[in-house]
Amino acid sequence: MASAGAGSTGHLDCMLLNAAIGINVTHVPYRGGGPAMQDLIAGRIDYFCTLSATARQQVDGKLIKAIAILSRDRSAMLPELASAREQGLDFEATTWFGFFFPKGTPEPIIQKLHDATVAAMDTPSVQERLKEVGAVTVASERRSPAYLQKFVLSEIEKNAAPIKAAGLAMD
């Protein structure tokens, strides 16, 4: 199994997938997704967890075979590809981004920056660009700083046991 680097999102997602299906494999960390993709195309690695936007061109060119989308639902980037859940695996892994501020940042500043970020994310040009790279924004009820805080804590809880079981640690 290859990833774009130790501790990368792809590494964590593949590791969680491996745990969900009960396999133990050797992790081959690369210095970025490009070299890993090259070795996948060349047949030097067995599989690679990466973003659908990263793999789309190679999938379309039939250079690689996509197996599953790891998010709950199908991706707009690869709509023909079933999710792992649709294929019978009770598993979900997604890449997400949040905006974080230093501890102690005054609430009015957080709210002002939050509101500006949400407004920018909702513009047609940003929505179009996100669509081009296979990304989506979350529903409005999931956009608050309080929701993000709860979500981050739930992600830590969800991932802690598999990370520990795999023996992963920060270097």
Give the location of each predicted region.
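Conserved, function-defining micro-sites of small-solute handling proteins
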Residues: 1-171
